[in-house]
Each structure stands twice: as C-alpha cells, then as structure tokens.
C-alpha cells in the first residue's frame, strides 16, 4: 500500500487483532486486519473494504460491537461533498460489518457520526455496564483556526462530549452520555439577547 497508519487493537475469540488504516496503490481506502495469538507475531488475515471505492484513505480504524451489531469505525478521506453530507474535509463514521474480522467480511453503507464540522478520529470504549461509548476529536488537522480567538490564545481543538452508541432496528443511534445529566442544575433565565 501507499500509506498505512493508526493501529488499533481488538480482542476477539481469544485472539488479538490489529486494525490499520490504509490507502492502496490504486488510491482506495481500506482497513488492514492482522491477527496474533501471542501479541508479538502478527499475520495479515483480511483487508476490509467496500464493494465500490469509498475515499482514497481510511484513517483511525476502530471496531465495536454495539447491541450485537459489529461496526468498523473509520475516517475516510477523499469523499466528494454532497449538499448535506460530507461537509468535512475528511469524514468520520462507521460501516456495519457482516462476518468475522479474519474471514469473509462484508461492509454495509457508511454511516456518518456527525454532520457538523470538526468531528474526527472517533474512538470507542466499553463501559463497565456494557455500553459502548464514543469520543471524537473536535478538530481537523488541515483546518485553519487562525481567525478563532481561542486558537489565537493557545486553545485549539478538544475532545467531544462522550456519546452512547445503540443499534436499534438496523439503525445507529447516538445519545449523550447519561452521566452528563449529573452536571445539570436549575435553569437560568437569560434576558433578551441583542
């Protein structure tokens, strides 16, 4: 391949898998899957890709099983802008996965995590109670934040508020992390804004 980056580790069926974001020599995005039984020696076992090319590079791969549905999380680069979709220079979302990481695997249609700007490099973690939580980077490496007063003062980009992922009737749902409710207090009425 031309470009490989962003390793992510996944444990499944007693084996350790390493996912790598990649760009093929034909300028097509994919995720490479390597398998290990001892955590030191890995062998390439799969290349995850869509039936039709989807971008020229997939960064930041991750893998999560949400309510029984496996998802490949990725940040495809080079997706043409549409009226209400793909407004970021690079995208962040997931592909529903059918099949094992190391075998015959089919990826479903890409689902964007966010239609706003500046959401990238999402990562999941599993809470003690089994919920799958999603964090993203509020920033784009190639964006010019020079006109932002925060950036001029040395504050630039941040992590997003965590989200809970749910798979309901064949669709991805995202909700704010329920623990955030503890941060709420009595409402404050603000006068007329000008």
Enumerate the predicted regions with their spans.
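Hydrophobic core segments of beta-strands in well-ordered, beta-rich domains
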Residues: 1-26, 31-34, 44-52, 60-64, ...
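Surface loop/turn signatures of beta-propeller and other carbohydrate-active proteins
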Residues: 1-11, 20, 41-62, 102-122, ...
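Residues that flank catalytic or metal-binding motifs in active/ligand-binding sites
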Residues: 5, 29-32, 44, 59, ...
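A short local loop/turn or secondary-structure capping micro-motif enriched for an aromatic residue
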Residues: 26-28, 52-54, 80-82, 116, ...
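Acidic, glycine-rich loop-and-beta core segments that form the ion-binding/anion-interacting portion
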Residues: 66, 76-78, 83-99
């Amino acid at each position: 391949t031309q470009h490989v980056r962003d390793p992510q580790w996944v444990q499944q069926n007693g084996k350790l898998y390493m996912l790598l974001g990649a760009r093929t020599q034909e300028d097509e995005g994919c995720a490479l899957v390597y398998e290990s039984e001892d955590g030191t020696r890995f062998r390439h076992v799969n290349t995850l890709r869509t039936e039709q090319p989807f971008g020229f590079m997939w960064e930041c791969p991750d893998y999560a099983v949400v309510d029984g549905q496996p998802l490949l999380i990725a940040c495809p680069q080079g997706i043409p802008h549409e009226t209400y979709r793909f407004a970021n220079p690079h995208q962040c979302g997931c592909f529903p996965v059918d099949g094992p990481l190391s075998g015959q695997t089919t990826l479903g249609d890409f689902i964007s995590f966010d239609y706003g700007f500046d959401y990238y490099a999402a990562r999941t973690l599993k809470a003690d109670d089994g919920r799958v939580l999603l964090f993203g980077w509020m920033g784009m490496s190639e964006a010019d934040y020079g006109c932002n007063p925060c950036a001029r003062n040395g504050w630039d980009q941040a992590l997003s508020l965590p989200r809970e992922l749910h798979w309901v009737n064949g669709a991805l749902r995202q909700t704010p992390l329920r623990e955030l409710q503890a941060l709420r207090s009595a409402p404050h009425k603000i006068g007329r804004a000008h």
